[in-house]
A protein has these predicted regions:
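P-loop NTPase Walker
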Residues: 1-104, 199, 281-284, 598
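Conserved helicase NTPase motor core
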Residues: 4-16, 20-24, 55, 63, ...
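ATP-hydrolysis module of ASCE/P-loop NTPase motor domains
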Residues: 17-18, 78, 99-182, 205, ...
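Helicase P-loop NTPase motor core
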Residues: 24, 28-36, 40, 263-266, ...
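Conserved helicase core region in the C-terminal RecA-like lobe
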Residues: 82-92, 209-212, 237, 352, ...
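ATPase/helicase motor core of nucleic-acid motors
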Residues: 261, 314-315, 340-467
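Accessory C-terminal helicase-associated subdomains
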Residues: 436-556, 577, 623
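Helicase C-terminal subdomain and adjacent C-terminal extension
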Residues: 611-631
Length: 631
């Protein structure tokens, strides 16, 4: 007799579900991986399904490997069941058909090499613009949504997209290259138009199990529909409330489509084995504000429902804390991190990489150990920070040629690169335009001289100012902030908020140092930490690092859990991020906030800023249903 004693009633119902399509709605911490592996065992041992006919699809290689390893602990059939990502499965289908050859898969560098020459034929282009085009092409191939695709491209390039897309596809075809997104399109066409191939794969996979079904895109859904046409045994596991990848083309609406088109049965895994009841209740108050979702009634496991216990001196496990400004919020975080038990896991979750690095830099200075899961670009390598540091080096008289080249026309100063001799200085530039032995008009020489003299006076002030005042002066008085706004309008309006956040971060960070040299050394030390991996570990093992606090973006925290979680900056423009009022955008941002809240097992603190009378900050709208948790 198959053992089901370790299953709760909902899990048991899902595991022993008979033939046909099933949508298993799996709330946070509800044991979905356990249920999937138990289902595979039940199919093999009770329904006598051949392991080779079972296909288990995940969204990442790590998830596929993890699930296969979990299954291997309970069964000797792990090597026979087909575990893989959408892309790896579709690649095998295309290989068998001969539509792709081994070695034809294009990596990121190869794709950049294909698109660079095409872009440069049209206009000057940066690596950032090339990357935005590749992202847009991938999004378009996955979704076919032209309007949203164009949002990913700088404004001045939008009219060029159709032509550049055609030229890129032509170049890719010439080298017989295939990228991940082509595989979806090719696979769908193969299964639609090639009856023998379609029938072979339909017979091959009699049962299809899909994890994280809320992250599926429409093309992936269509391929699953083709594969499942014969048997219709699709076991789709997901939670539409945790759908946070629309920027990759994910469409949680496919879950509703699956229920309609397949007439799928629905089962809800309602018991949360991770979080205390207070956290479950608070997170539900937030997510219930979303309208476009499957309604759910969730509860904590019996063990997590004991409310009489106090934790850290309070009977409630969820608290909202308000602070006047970011430094006050940071002081509170430092205090909490220093007093916590190192035996417990804890994490600070951020909406953006920038906010995460700001806290990481401060923890490093305070000697508080931390790890970062995701590989993240060093903020000090961002062009804005590099520009600011070039200004400071010019003021200090330690600048090199590259520093002048970076900022001569940020903002525009009428200065040509031809004015640069072997040794560059502001005085040398002024001499070049003053002597008038160049090819420029008298008016042009006069304007350049005026700009350089003003620049010299500005740099004299910067030279004698402490870093925070110096950076503020460069941004405001020297016109660097104005230059960024103009550039954002030309390239991509979506960059405006990101660049504004970076400038605010630089000003705040500069305030921790007395000299530019001291600040430069701190930047180098932080960069060294990232390079050596002191501040970053990959994989779930990092969760158990001795006494270290985990720093993660919300997206990177998905699937993880911690005893204590802090979510700083629960303010408008951060949660939800940006200025968009589109209902779809707000609902996704609310889901992101929900995912962050549901990472907590025992203790959850939501931190927000109130600002000052002159510069008020507004708490996130997502906190409105949580007023009773204010402390």
């Amino acid at each position: 007799m198959f053992n089901l004693t370790d299953c709760n009633p909902s899990q048991r119902e899902a595991v022993t579900f008979g033939e046909g399509p099933l949508l298993l709605l799996a709330g946070p911490g509800s044991g979905k991986t356990f249920t999937i592996t138990k289902r595979i065992l039940w199919l093999i041992h009770e329904k006598e399904v051949a392991p080779e006919q079972i296909l288990v699809i995940t969204f990442t290689r790590e998830a596929a490997l993890s699930m296969q390893q979990r299954f291997a602990q309970t069964s000797s059939f792990a090597g026979s069941v087909n575990f893989g990502t959408f892309h790896s499965i579709f690649y095998q289908i295309l290989l068998r058909s001969g539509r792709v050859q081994p070695g034809n898969l294009l990596n990121e560098k190869q794709k950049l090499n294909l698109i660079y020459p095409i872009l440069k034929k049209n206009k000057e282009c940066s690596a950032e613009i090339a990357k935005s085009f590749l992202d847009a092409i991938a999004y378009y191939k996955n979704t076919g949504e032209k309007e949203k695709t164009l949002e990913k491209i700088p404004e001045e390039w939008k009219n060029c997209f159709p032509q550049i897309y055609r030229e890129y596809e032509s170049a890719r075809t010439k080298v017989r290259g295939v990228d991940f997104d082509d595989m979806l399109k090719e696979c769908e066409e193969l299964l639609q138009n090639n009856t023998p191939q379609r029938e072979y794969w339909q017979k091959r996979f009699s049962h299809i199990l899909i994890d994280e079904f809320q992250d599926i895109n429409y093309r992936q859904y269509c391929i699953v529909r083709l594969l499942a046409e014969r048997h219709k045994n699709v076991f789709a596991v997901g939670d539409d409330d945790q759908a946070i990848y629309s920027f990759r083309g994910a469409r949680p609406a496919c879950m509703q489509m699956f229920v309609r088109e397949f007439a799928a049965t629905q089962i809800l895994l309602r018991t949360n084995y991770r979080s205390h009841q207070d956290i479950v209740e608070a997170s539900l108050l937030v997510i219930n504000e979303n309208l476009d979702r499957f309604p759910k009634i969730l509860e904590a496991s019996e063990l997590n429902q004991r409310k009489e216990e106090t934790y850290r001196g309070t009977a409630c496990r969820v608290r909202i804390k308000e602070f006047r400004d970011a430094p006050e919020q940071m002081q509170y975080l430092l205090h909490r991190l220093k007093e916590r038990s190192t035996q417990e896991t804890c994490a600070i979750l951020f909406r953006t990489n920038l906010a995460m690095q700001s806290v990481a830099a401060r923890l490093g200075r305070e000697g508080i150990p931390y790890v970062m899961k995701e590989k993240t670009r060093n903020i000090y390598e961002h062009f804005i920070v590099q520009d600011i540091m070039s200004y400071l080096r010019i003021a200090a008289g330690t600048a090199e040629r590259i520093d002048f080249l970076r900022v001569i026309n940020k903002p525009f100063r009428n200065i040509s690169r031809e004015a640069f001799g072997k040794h560059v200085s502001l005085q040398a530039l002024e001499d070049y335009y003053s002597m008038k032995n160049n090819d420029y008009s008298a008016d042009c020489n006069r304007k350049a001289c005026e700009a350089i003299r003003l620049w010299k006076r500005q740099m004299e002030f910067v030279k004698n100012a402490e870093p925070k005042l110096a950076v503020t002066f460069v941004c405001k008085a020297c016109g660097y902030e104005r230059y960024l706004r103009q550039r954002a309008n030309v390239e991509n309006n979506e960059k405006t908020q990101e660049w504004e956040e970076i400038l605010n971060y630089i000003v705040e960070e500069a305030g921790h140092f007395k000299t530019a040299k001291e600040w430069q050394e701190a930047q180098e030390a932080f960069g060294e930490q990232l390079r050596k991996g002191v501040a970053r570990e990959s994989g779930d093992n990092a969760q158990a690092a001795d006494g270290a606090v985990r720093l993660l973006t919300v997206h990177a925290s998905k699937g993880l859990e911690f005893d204590s979680v802090w979510i700083p900056d629960c303010n408008e423009k951060n949660f939800p991020h940006g200025n968009g009022l589109d209902p779809e955008h707000i609902e996704e941002e609310r889901r992101i906030f929900y995912v962050a809240m549901t990472r907590a097992k025992k203790d959850l603190e939501l931190l927000c800023l109130t600002g000052t009378a002159e510069r008020p900050r507004f708490p996130s709208r997502f906190l409105i249903p949580l007023n009773r948790y204010r402390r």
